[in-house]
């Protein structure tokens, strides 16, 4: 594995608060070209390390690096520093971002001095592959001391960007066991990202077991514990709301059935009333005929 000296590049941005987004000139580190982008994401300052001039790179190129970002004031004093992250750059992964380098409110205080923002990036290139074969899904890469599949590189790298201390207390040496724990961690994250309603009691029970195993192995997963509690509560509320809906639907169904029965009864009663009214009318007609001396047809019908 190649091991180049760490190099630094400083990017000074005038009037950054007005611009909100800036891209640095290209610089060289480890014999490779790089550039950084600085911009604001919601309430934080974000910085990205990227690879330029892709058309000049050969098929199968890869770069493995360690990098960190530093925010400086006009006097060169360090105000904020990100954790050092190991990242793999390739055709599918052209850049890596630190989305929360500094809160925006603190950034405004920094930029008050001559309205200038200064970002320093420290890059150490660990390995460069200028040309290679086709990368397969089963190929393994080492990210922060853990062997992971090529298809997992992006997720694991981002995991260490967002939670840089997650594995500092892991003392397991066996690489196969370390890989197994990373797979458990990724699976747990995927489970908790699902809709609470879609999770079963078994899913939640397994999630608690996996969380306990990760904690015992030394992983710092308090943020996942909190998320598991939130998901469990959300599922409980969803089930409760769902039960109420089912009860209401059943009540509506019963009321509709009762209403249909009443309509049938009303229809039958209406027919009976009409029949009686007709009989009364017939009786009145026969009564009038009798009074006029005409034969009483109703009487004859009843007699014969």
UniProtKB/Swiss-Prot annotation:
Keywords: Coiled coil. Residues 219-292 form a coiled coil. Residues 6-123 form the MATH domain. It comes from the Eukaryota. Pfam families: MATH. Transmembrane segments: none annotated. PROSITE patterns: MATH. PANTHER family: MATH DOMAIN-CONTAINING PROTEIN (PTHR46236:SF12), TRAF-LIKE SUPERFAMILY PROTEIN (PTHR46236). This is MATH domain and coiled-coil domain-containing protein At2g42470. It comes from Arabidopsis thaliana (Mouse-ear cress). The lineage of its organism: Eukaryota, Viridiplantae, Streptophyta, Embryophyta, Tracheophyta.
């Amino acid at each position: 594995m190649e091991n180049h000296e760490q190099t630094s590049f400083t990017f000074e941005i005038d009037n950054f608060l007005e611009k909100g987004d800036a891209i640095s000139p290209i610089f060289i580190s480890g014999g490779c070209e790089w550039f950084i982008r600085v911009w604001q994401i919601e309430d934080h300052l974000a910085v990205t390390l990227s690879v330029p001039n892709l058309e000049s790179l050969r098929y199968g190129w890869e770069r493995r690096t360690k990098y960190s970002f530093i925010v400086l004031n006009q006097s060169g004093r360090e105000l904020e520093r990100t954790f050092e992250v190991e990242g793999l750059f390739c055709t599918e992964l052209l850049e890596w971002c630190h989305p929360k380098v500094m809160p925006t409110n603190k950034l405004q205080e920094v930029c008050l001095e001559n309205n200038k923002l200064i970002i320093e990036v420290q890059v150490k290139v660990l390995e460069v592959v200028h040309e290679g074969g086709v990368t397969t899904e089963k190929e393994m890469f080492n990210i922060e001391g853990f062997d992971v599949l090529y298809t997992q590189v992006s997720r694991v790298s981002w995991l260490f960007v967002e939670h840089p201390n997650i594995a500092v207390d892991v003392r397991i040496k066996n690489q196969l066991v370390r890989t197994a724990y990373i797979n458990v961690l990724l699976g747990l994250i995927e489970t908790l990202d699902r809709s609470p309603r879609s999770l079963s009691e078994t899913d939640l029970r397994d999630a608690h077991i996996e969380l306990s195993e990760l904690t015992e192995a030394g992983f710092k997963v308090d943020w996942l514990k909190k998320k598991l509690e939130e998901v469990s509560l959300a599922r409980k509320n969803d089930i409760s709301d769902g039960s109420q809906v089912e009860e209401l639907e059943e009540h509506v169904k019963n009321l509709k059935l009762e209403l249909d029965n009443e309509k049938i009864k009303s229809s039958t009663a209406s027919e009976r009333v009409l029949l009686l009214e007709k009989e009364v009318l017939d009786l009145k007609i026969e009564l009038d005929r009798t009074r006029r001396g005409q034969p009483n047809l109703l009487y004859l019908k009843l007699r014969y």
